Amino acid sequence: TGILVGMGESKSSRIESLKVIAEIQKTFGNIQEVIVQNFLPKVGTAMHKHPPCPESDFLETIALARIILPKEIHIQAPPNLSDDFRKLLTVGIDDWGGVSPVTKDHVNPERPWPDLEKLKQVTESEGFELVPRLTIYPEFASNLKKWVSSDVSFPVMELSDSSGYARSDPL
């Protein structure tokens, strides 16, 4: 799940949304991640003249997400929508999302993915490790009977290592 920041909502509305997500997690325990995305106007849309999300609002919302949401929820922000994606790590994200050296960002095709080597350098300089993962997070992949349909359990096992991350030697 996630929230889009900077479309005219208030800070209190963003906080309330994060609190609702936290409550859902406490009740069901099924939220892998919360994507916090900054609004950027797009040509050809009804909001093309709306100003982009101020960076301060975006960074503050990520920090609030880290404070409000339970620790087991990963916080994600797209690195290609920020001029300085290092800041995203410093305020609380722990996941870059579906960054690909092969495909474009299908949601924001006008914003290319950053170079993976640069993303790795920035990530490591902030004390983190850039590790490939499946679309399912490791803690969910490690508990297949609870979280994954038996129809896809075997492919998940085949594609993940013993920690639940993507195998470096996929079969």
Predicted regions and their residues:
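Short, glycine-rich nucleotide/cofactor-binding loops
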Residues: E9-S10
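Auxiliary Fe-S-binding modules of radical SAM enzymes
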Residues: I15-L171
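Radical SAM/AdoMet-radical enzyme domain recognition
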Residues: T1-L4
